[in-house]
Swiss-Prot record:
Organism this protein belongs to: Thermotoga maritima (strain ATCC 43589 / DSM 3109 / JCM 10099 / NBRC 100826 / MSB8)
EC number: 6.1.1.5
Lineage: superkingdom: Bacteria
Residues binding Zn(2+), per UniProt: C887, C890, C907, C910
GO BP terms in the entry: isoleucyl-tRNA aminoacylation
Originating gene: ileS
GO molecular function: aminoacyl-tRNA deacylase activity; ATP binding; isoleucine-tRNA ligase activity; tRNA binding; zinc ion binding
'KMSKS' region, short sequence motif: residues: 594-598
Catalysis: reaction(s): tRNA(Ile) + L-isoleucine + ATP = L-isoleucyl-tRNA(Ile) + AMP + diphosphate
Name this protein carries in UniProt: Isoleucine--tRNA ligase
Keyword Transferase set for record: no
Length: 919
C-alpha cells in the first residue's frame, strides 16, 4: 500500500517564490480600486484620532534613499496605529517654493532666464515643482505607503499660501518682524543683490594669507588668522574661535601665537615656521572678550568671539570676523555679540571713505596693496595663493562679494517668544530623548531669524516702499488685503499686478501720509512656508486637530522644520504644533561614508524596488536601528532577501497545514490543547506582548529581530518541526492534529498582523490566502492588532519548558554526533537515554514523559541511572540506534510492527489511524 497517500501533507496556493516586483504592482492596483486610504479610515469611524503630520519633501527631483526611508517609517507608524484601533489619517505634503527649485529651473532655462520677467520665471518654477510632485507621488505609492495621495497639501497652492501669509501677519501684528542690515551676495559688476539661485561656483584664484593680530594687553601675544579675502580686513571687527576646540600657545622667537592644536602641523608645513615649542594649551572660550589691535587701523580693536561654525579643516581655527561681508560673521559677530557692521564697499565694489587710504580702489585691486601694508607692519605671517571653488554671478560670470544690505527678520525674543518656545519644548515627548536638549540648545543660542530672500520663487513679503519719504512699510492691513487676492489668484499676483491693486484703497504712508508706493520684491524664507503647515492642515482638515500627534523627520530637522514649526505655532497658537517628535538618522554607505555621486555609492530606492521589490527595502529599514545613522548598499539590501525567504516559508508552512482548518468548527478549546501546543500558545502571547511594546516605542528593529528569531529558531527549528508528525500522520480530525492546528492558526493570524505594518505587500498576500472566515475586511490593513491573552500563559509550564528545551539542545548535539558517526541517519532512527543530574530533573522528565519523543523527534526516550556519553548541564545523554523496525508510514521505530493484511509494516499508532480508531 502507498502510505504516502494516507498522510495529511501541506496544501496551499500561496507560492514559494514571491515574485515581489510583479506581485506588488498587482496589490497596488487592487488598493487603488478599493480606494484603500478612505476604506481603512471608514473602518475606524468614530475611533480616537492619531495624526502623524507629514513634513514636506522638496519637489525638486526624484525621491532618494533618505526620503524613501522617511516615508516608509511614517507608513509603519500610521499602519500600526490603525491596527491598534486609531483613526490615523495621513496627508502627504510637498515643499514647492525656494532655492532648490529655482536653481534647477535656472539651470534648465540657461540664458533664456535673463529675458524673462519674475512672473514668467515663477510660472516655470511652478510647472517644474508640480511635475516632480506627480513623479514623487507615484514613487512613494510604489513603496507601499498609504496616504491621501489625491488630496495632498502643496505649499504653492493659493489656499496654502494664504495660511503662510496669515501666520506671517500674526507675527507682524505682534511686533516680532523688523528690518535691518544683513550681508548678502552682491555682484559689483551688475550692481545688484543676488539670490543663491543666481550663484554659480567656479574655480577662482585667491590670495591665501596668514595674519597675526596683536593683543592689546600683551604686545608679544598674538592670534593668527587665515583669510582668502584680504580686502575684507578693513571691515574687521572681531576674531572667532570655537568655544570647545583646544588651542596651542606657541613660542615663536619672543612672541606667543595662538593656533588650533589640530592645525599646527599643517600650518608649520605650509608656512615653514617651527611650532614645536608649545608653552600652553587653552580652550577657545578662555579668550572670549579679549581685545586685539586691528590689522589695518591702529586706533580700532578686534574682539574675540565664540562661534561653533569654526572648523578644523583649514587655516588656524581662528577666523577674522567682518559682519558687513559674511553671513556667519554677521550672525555670530553682529547678532550674537553686537559687533558693528562695517561695510566700506559701494555698489560698484569700490572702497568708500570708511576704508581710509583704500578709498576708490576696486576691492580685488586692493588685495595686493593690503598685503604689502600688512607685510610692512610686520604682521603678515605668510602669503601664497589658492585655487578654490568660489561664488560667481550667473549673469556676468564674475566673482561676487558679500555686502550688507537691508533684510527682514523675526525677533525671537520680542514678546518673550524664545522663552515660550523653550517652555513648549519641555512639554513635547522627544524620541530619542536627546532630541529635547538638541533643539533646546539650538533655540537658546539662535540669533534672530532672517526671513527675507532676494529670490523670485517664494511667497512674497507684502511690503511696500513710500516713493515720497522712502519709508518701507509692512502693515497687517496690506497683508490682509493681499491675502484676499491670493485666495483667488495665488501669490503670483504680487508680481503681476500694479501696487495700487495690492494695497487697500484708503492706505497711506504712516510716516508722511502720502499714497505713492512701490512694491518690495523680497520673498519669505521657505522654512516659513513649511513651518506654517500646522496652520493649513489643522484649519483645512477636520481630522487634523491642533496640536498634531507626531512629527517624524531626520535629526537635521531640529534645526529645520521642527524648529520653524514650533516658533510659528507658539506665535500663532500659543503652543507647540506637535505632542511627539520622532527623529531618524541619516543613510550612509557600507563604510559609513556619506552618499555622493562622486564616490559612486548612491543607492537609488527605485532601483532596489525594481530589482528586489519594495518589500525588501521595507524589511531592510525595519532591520536598521534608524535612531542612529543607517548603512546601506546593494549587498546589504540583498542580505534581506534571505531573511525574507525564511519569513515567507514560515507563512507558507502555516498556510499549507491549515488548508483544511475551519477556525469556527475545528478550534480546540484552550483547556483541551496538548501540552506542547499550550506551551507554544503561551510563547506566542509573550511574542505579542514584546512586539507591541517595541512598536509602542517605535523600535522597529527590535520587532524585526524578535520576529526573525521567532520564525527561524522557535517555529521552523522547534515547534513546527516537532508538530509535523502530528500534522501529517494523525487522523485529519483528531485532537492531536486539531490541537496543533488551533495554535498554528493563532500564530499565523498574530504573526501576520505583527508584520503587516512592515511587510505591507506580503502580509496582504497572506491575508488573501486565509480562510474566508478569517478575512473580516477587504485588506489586512483594516484588521485589529492581536490581543495579548495573559490567561494563555501557564507560568509553571513555561518554566518547565525552559529546562526541557535546554535538555533538547543537549539531545540535538548528541544526535548530531551519532549522525556524523553514521550510527543514525534521521533523528527518528534514534533512541535517547537520559540520565538526570538530580531528582528535580528526574521528576520533570517523568512529568513530561509522554511528550519527550515528540519534543526530541526520536523513536524512543528512556531514563537511566547509568552514566551518559554527552555531559549536559541538566542531563547526560546517550544516543543509540532504536530497536525494532521502521514504520513504513511515520518512520518511527517500533518492536510492534503490524502484520495486518490491510496495513502491513506500520506501528500501532499508524494502524489505529488507518483503521479510524484514533481520534
Amino acid at each position: 500500500m502507498e502510505y504516502k497517500n494516507t498522510l495529511n501533507l501541506p496544501k496551499t496556493s500561496f507560492p514559494m517564490k514571491a515574485n515581489l516586483v510583479n506581485k506588488e504592482k498587482v496589490f497596488l492596483e487592487e488598493w487603488e480600486k478599493m480606494d484603500l486610504y478612505n476604506y481603512v479610515l471608514e473602518q475606524r469611524k468614530g475611533k480616537p484620532l492619531f495624526v502623524l503630520h507629514d513634513g514636506p519633501p522638496y519637489a525638486n527631483g526624484h525621491i532618494h534613499i533618505g526620503t524613501a526611508l522617511n516615508k516608509i517609517l511614517k507608513d509603519i507608524v500610521v499602519k500600526y496605529k490603525t491596527m491598534r484601533g486609531y483613526r490615523a489619517p495621513y496627508v502627504p505634503g510637498w515643499d514647492t517654493h525656494g532655492l532648490p527649485i529655482e536653481h534647477r529651473v535656472s539651470q534648465e532655462l540657461g540664458e533664456k532666464i535673463k529675458e524673462m520677467s519674475p512672473a514668467e520665471i515663477r510660472k516655470k518654477c511652478e510647472e517644474f515643482a508640480l511635475r516632480f510632485v506627480d513623479i514623487q507621488r507615484e514613487e512613494f505609492k510604489r513603496l507601499g505607503v498609504r496616504g491621501d495621495w489625491e488630496n495632498p497639501y502643496i505649499t504653492l497652492k493659493p489656499d496654502y499660501e494664504v495660511k503662510i501669509l496669515d501666520v506671517f501677519k500674526t507675527l507682524v501684528e505682534q511686533g516680532n518682524v523688523y528690518r535691518s542690515l544683513k550681508p548678502i551676495y552682491w555682484c559689483p559688476r551688475c550692481r545688484t543683490a543676488l539670490a543663491e539661485a543666481e550663484i554659480e561656483y567656479h574655480d577662482h584664484k585667491s590670495p591665501s594669507i596668514y595674519v597675526k593680530f596683536r593683543s592689546k594687553e600683551d604686545p608679544n601675544f598674538f592670534i593668527v588668522i587665515w583669510t582668502t579675502t584680504p580686502w575684507t580686513l578693513p571691515a574687521n571687527v572681531g576674531i572667532a574661535l570655537h568655544p570647545d576646540y583646544e588651542y596651542s600657545v606657541v613660542k615663536v622667537g619672543e612672541e606667543k601665537w595662538v593656533i588650533a592644536t589640530d592645525l599646527l602641523d599643517a600650518f608649520s608645513k605650509e608656512t615653514g615656521i617651527d611650532c614645536s615649542n608649545v608653552v600652553e594649551k587653552i580652550k577657545g572660550k578662555d579668550l572670549e572678550g579679549k581685545e586685539f589691535v586691528h590689522p589695518i587701523f591702529d586706533d580700532r580693536t578686534s574682539r574675540v568671539i565664540l562661534a561653533d561654525y569654526v572648523s578644523l579643516e583649514t587655516g588656524t581655527g581662528c577666523v577674522h570676523i567682518a559682519p558687513g561681508h559674511g553671513e556667519e560673521d554677521y550672525i555670530y559677530g553682529h547678532v550674537q555679540y553686537g559687533l558693528p557692521i562695517v561695510s566700506p564697499v559701494d555698489e560698484e565694489g569700490r572702497f568708500t571713505e570708511e576704508a581710509g587710504k583704500y578709498k576708490g580702489m576696486f576691492i580685488e585691486d586692493a588685495n595686493e596693496v593690503i598685503i604689502e601694508d600688512l607685510k610692512r607692519k610686520g604682521i603678515l605671517v605668510h602669503a601664497s595663493s589658492i585655487t578654490h571653488s568660489y561664488p560667481h554671478c550667473w549673469r556676468c560670470k564674475g566673482p561676487v562679494i558679500f555686502r550688507a544690505t537691508e533684510q527682514w527678520f523675526i525677533s525671537v525674543d520680542h514678546n518673550n517668544l524664545r522663552q515660550k518656545v523653550l517652555e513648549e519644548i519641555d512639554k513635547v515627548k522627544w524620541i530619542p530623548e536627546w532630541g529635547r536638549n538638541r533643539i533646546r540648545s539650538m533655540v537658546e543660542e539662535r540669533p534672530d531669524w532672517c526671513i527675507s530672500r532676494q529670490r523670485v520663487w517664494g511667497t512674497p513679503i507684502p511690503a511696500v516702499k513710500c516713493k515720497e519719504c522712502g519709508e518701507v512699510v509692512l502693515d497687517p492691513k496690506v497683508i490682509e488685503h493681499f491675502m484676499k487676492i491670493v485666495e483667488k489668484e495665488g501669490t503670483n499676483a504680487w508680481f503681476e499686478k500694479e501696487v495700487e491693486e495690492l494695497i487697500p484703497e484708503d492706505f497711506v504712508c504712516p510716516k508722511c501720509g502720502k499714497r505713492s508706493f512701490e512694491k518690495m520684491l523680497d520673498t519669505l524664507d521657505v522654512w516659513i512656508d513649511s513651518g506654517a503647515s500646522f496652520e493649513y492642515i489643522t484649519t483645512k482638515r477636520e481630522d487634523h486637530p491642533f496640536p498634531l500627534d507626531m512629527y517624524l523627520e531626520g535629526s537635521d530637522q531640529h534645526r529645520g522644520w521642527f524648529h520653524s514649526s514650533i516658533f510659528l505655532a507658539v506665535a500663532k497658537r500659543g503652543s507647540a504644533p506637535y505632542k511627539e517628535v520622532l527623529t531618524h538618522g541619516f543613510i550612509k554607505d557600507e563604510q559609513g561614508r556619506k552618499m555622493s555621486k562622486s564616490l559612486g555609492n548612491v543607492v537609488d530606492p527605485m532601483e532596489v524596488v525594481e530589482k528586489y521589490g519594495a518589500e525588501i527595502l521595507r524589511l531592510w529599514l525595519a532591520s536598521s536601528d534608524y535612531f542612529n545613522d543607517i548603512k546601506i548598499s546593494m549587498r546589504i539590501v540583498e542580505q534581506q532577501t534571505e531573511v525574507y525567504r525564511k519569513i515567507r516559508n514560515t507563512f507558507r508552512f502555516l498556510l499549507g497545514n491549515l488548508e483544511d482548518f475551519d477556525p469556527e468548527l475545528d478550534r480546540v478549546p484552550h483547556e483541551k490543547l496538548l501540552t506542547i501546543d499550550r506551551w507554544a500558545l503561551g510563547r506566542l502571547q509573550e511574542i505579542i506582548k514584546r512586539a507591541t511594546e517595541y512598536y509602542d516605542s517605535y523600535e522597529f528593529s527590535k520587532v524585526y529581530n524578535l520576529v526573525v528569531k521567532y520564525c527561524t529558531t522557535e517555529l521552523s527549528s522547534l515547534y513546527l518541526d516537532v508538530v509535523k508528525d502530528r500534522l501529517y500522520v494523525e487522523a485529519k480530525d483528531s485532537i492531536y492534529r486539531r490541537s496543533a492546528q488551533t495554535v498554528m492558526h493563532e500564530i499565523l493570524i498574530s504573526l501576520m498582523k505583527i508584520l503587516a505594518p512592515i511587510m505591507t505587500f506580503t502580509m496582504e498576500e497572506v491575508y488573501s490566502h486565509l480562510h474566508e472566515k478569517d478575512r473580516k475586511y477587504k485588506t489586512v490593513q483594516a484588521e485589529y492588532w492581536p490581543e495579548y491573552r495573559e490567561e494563555f500563559i501557564d507560568r509553571k509550564l513555561m518554566e518547565d519548558f525552559e529546562k526541557l528545551l535546554s535538555i533538547r539542545e543537549d539531545v540535538l548535539k548528541a544526535l548530531e554526533e551519532k549522525r556524523q558517526q553514521d550510527v543514525i541517519g534521521h533523528s527518528l532512527d534514534a533512541e535517547v537515554v537520559l540520565v538526570p543530574k538530580n531528582d528535580t530533573i528526574k521528576a520533570l522528565l517523568e512529568k513530561y514523559r509522554d511528550i519527550l519523543e515528540e519534543l526530541f523527534i526520536v523513536s524512543k526516550v528512556s531514563l537511566s541511572d547509568a552514566s551518559g556519553e554527552l555531559k549536559g548541564e541538566l542531563v547526560e545523554v546517550t544516543v543509540k540506534h532504536a530497536e525494532g523496525e521502521k514504520c513504513q508510514r511515520c518512520w518511527k521505530y517500533t518492536t510492534e510492527i503490524s502484520a495486518s493484511e490491510d496495513f502491513p509494516g506500520v506501528c500501532p499508532r499508524c494502524l489505529a489511524v488507518l483503521k479510524g480508531e484514533r481520534k
